[in-house]
Amino acid sequence: MLTYENWQEPSITFQEDDLYKGALSVLKWAYGHYGDQLVYACSFGIEGIVLIDLIAKVKKDARIVFLDTGLHFKETYDTIDAVKERYPGLDIVLKTPELTVEEQNDQHGDQLWKTDPQSCCHMRKVIPLQEALSGYPAWLSGLRREQSPKRAGTNFLNKDEKFKSVKVCPLIHWTWKDIWRYASREELTYNPLHDQGYPSIGCAPCTQPAFTAQDLRSGRWSGTAKTECGLHE
């Protein structure tokens, strides 16, 4: 089994010129290789909705983890409920941080996401994901190369130094248009905030509509130098 500890550049070749741009063949390999030891950390944005639909074609009881910071939009929780209804076999887990938002306010000051967004993301996202991935040799992510310069070098299989794991990214070759074509063709239910100018959706206090169509993540942590929550750095 390919793990972080025995990592070597994989010699596996995935078919990249098919209808799914390699995504389905990557998922078939990943679940064939890792089985129940593969977990998908999903934000339930449109990429996540597409990837869940692809996952369900391969493993109907796959484990899906959502990092429930307690600060998400109501529309995000409604989307999760819709996904649960459409794919009842999936094992969808909402992972919460150690501290509630109120406890965090008491211990670290009100609205830490404004005063120290890096620490807020670390406590409410990074640490919970570390806990959720504990014991799993690999995890799935919906990263696409097109999303940002930092993500442009992502491969199908990646040695993840952050979480000491193997990160599997089936959608790296998909464009924004590919994502929406698939969602439309398969009639997928998605977060309605996408139709209100939010291409990238995270916690409500730190997410605004995108300022430019060229940078789909420009609405995240607006007014700060922060561009990632820390999960993919």
From Swiss-Prot:
Annotated residues for binding of [4Fe-4S] cluster: C120, C121, C203, C206
Subcellular location: Cytoplasm
GO BP, sorted A to Z: cysteine biosynthetic process; hydrogen sulfide biosynthetic process; sulfate assimilation, phosphoadenylyl sulfate reduction by phosphoadenylyl-sulfate reductase (thioredoxin)
Needed co-factor(s): [4Fe-4S] cluster
Catalytically driven reaction(s): [thioredoxin]-disulfide + sulfite + AMP + 2 H(+) = adenosine 5'-phosphosulfate + [thioredoxin]-dithiol
Cofactor notes: Binds 1 [4Fe-4S] cluster per subunit.
InterPro entries reported for this sequence: APS_reductase, PAPS/APS_Rdtase, PAPS_reduct_dom, Rossmann-like_a/b/a_fold
Gene3D superfamilies reported in the protein's UniProt record: HUPs
Name of the protein in question: Adenosine 5'-phosphosulfate reductase
Organism: Bacillus pumilus (strain SAFR-032)
